[in-house]
Amino acid sequence: MQPVLFRTLSLGVAIAAASSSAFAATLDGGAVAAPDEYGAKVAAQILKAGGNAVDAAVATAFTLAVTYPEAGNIGGGGFMTLYMDGKPYFLDYREVAPKAASKTMYLDDKGEVIENLSLVGAKAAGVPGTVMGLWEAHKRFGKLPWSELLTPAIGYAQKGFKVADKQFQYRQDAVALFNGKTNFGDYFGHMKAGEAFLQPDLAKTLERIADKGPDEFYKGHTADLLVAQMQQDKGLITHQDLADYKVRWREPMRVDWQGNTLYTAPLPSSGGIALAQLLGIKENRAADFKGVELNSARYIHLLAEIEKRVFADRADYLGDPDFSKVPVARLTDPAYLKQRAAEVNPTAISPTEKVRPGLEPHQTTHFSIVDADGNAVSNTYTLNWDFGSGVVVKGAGFLLNDEMDDFSAKPGVANAFGVVGSDANAIEPGKRMLSSMSPSIVTRDGKVSLVVGTPGGSRIFTSIFQVLNNIYDFHLPLEKAVAAQRVHHQLLPKDTIYYDAYAPLAGKVAEELKAMGYTLEDQGWNMGDIQAIRVDGKALETASDPRGRGVGLVVKP
């Protein structure tokens, strides 16, 4: 059986229009890179109708909740990085722990983690944020009427969409995992490859949200259905949890490098801090990379040396900034990055046990959008695993997340991605769980030049890091930069480098890495699903990762 995975969707859009902004960018048309053909078509449709980047993002997110149910959602949460009228913004609509959650809720009487309790079933679900997040983004920046943006998704739910072969395989794996544990099979058991899949209950839910806005989801009939499902399945989410949910507008993480500015996710995502550290440490070791061939054994070793230090810091320090004091400034300080860079061994593996925190003590979906005014949206949202917790809200037709696994159920014990955490990411009521989602926007001279994101759990920021290297250091065309081999190392398991079947480590490179002492492992799923748009003057370029089933389109005015 194929492993059930964590998925992320990615989409990018741009369109030409008149603008009065000082950061205006009149483009040759629009563009979209989305994780499936339906999301791409809807984004293009909204742009042609005069919608802006946020309008296209909202419509695409709701569409993917229908056509990409393994990750697209209204029962999960996410992050959105925006660049509007020359100013960066970050919207945190991550799920939160229910009020009844506790630090020991996934432990047995002996204090050990109960297998799969934080991954499968109603108790794995955090309070969803997607509907409120999309509403708040639209309320602040949208142009087209809210109800119009849900119309395409409602149509696909009512009339169906053609199930892709790969999507059907994910469904098969999920049925095996959830069999007898959730009601997943009642809703998705009749899905067949190549045939239309209809979701009438979900269509009615989306119609109610289109008509009444987020109050329908958090306080209306949909909320009643969700709470009834929780009570039936012994979950924790209550009416009060839903009514109290709020998004957070935060200052985006900013990284300046090579004349570019990267805007990406701040805490409670680890991705922004990680990207700042990865880029900063690499810059301090520039001499080691000089003349080194892309994805050679030496190049991969240098990446592993940097990545293991970033993951050591992630495990010890990072969590929800509303609950824990996180030393962000110190972790990204140039002097600290120089110190960490000095620890890198360019020729041999640094012993894992000596790589400590440097200070004193799946499935996810992403889309990216750029409009003619130079505005951009980079959005990542998720259910965590493929099809989340496997629990479908009866009568409402949507899946609930299993994001509670992103907390540290027990400090020092790995989650489903093999990533460990500390008390900074321990479970507390109302707390946002740590994430790796890293929706990113690159600007140069105040104008958007790249919008990029990917799924992949702990592989998200290492994948984006490698794509940035491919573009800015190796000067690869966007499609080749996205398609190139990617690898991953995260400190633990010890001296292990992961690859995927799309671009396996083999031949001379593999032998050289093994000779250095590395263990090479096929992780069993794709190393991300990058969706990217590049803006060069007026020209638009899209790239949809060949590892997935995404589509890139240029939209002419």
Swiss-Prot record:
Q: Could you tell me which pathway this protein works in?
A: Sulfur metabolism; glutathione metabolism
Entry annotation: catalytic residues: T364 (nucleophile)
Q: Where is the signal peptide?
A: 1-24
An example molecular function term from Gene Ontology annotations: leukotriene C4 gamma-glutamyl transferase activity
BP-aspect Gene Ontology terms: glutathione biosynthetic process; glutathione catabolic process; proteolysis
EC numbers: 3.4.19.13, 2.3.2.2
Q: Which residues bind L-glutamate?
A: R94, T382, N384, E403, D406, S435, S436, G456, G457
Tell me what PTMs the record reports for this protein.
Answer: Cleaved by autocatalysis into a large and a small subunit.
* Ranges annotated as spanning the membrane: none
Keywords in alphabetical order, please.
Answer: Acyltransferase, Glutathione biosynthesis, Hydrolase, Periplasm, Protease, Signal, Transferase, Zymogen
Localization in the cell: Periplasm
* SUPFAM superfamilies (UniProt xref): N-terminal nucleophile aminohydrolases (Ntn hydrolases)
Tell me what reaction this enzyme catalyses: an N-terminal (5-L-glutamyl)-[peptide] + an alpha-amino acid = 5-L-glutamyl amino acid + an N-terminal L-alpha-aminoacyl-[peptide]; glutathione + H2O = L-cysteinylglycine + L-glutamate; an S-substituted glutathione + H2O = an S-substituted L-cysteinylglycine + L-glutamate
**What would be one Gene Ontology cellular-component term for the protein?**
periplasmic space
Q: Which family does it belong to?
A: Belongs to the gamma-glutamyltransferase family.
Subunit comment: This enzyme consists of two polypeptide chains, which are synthesized in precursor form from a single polypeptide.
Q: Output this protein's name.
A: Glutathione hydrolase proenzyme
Protein's gene:
ggt
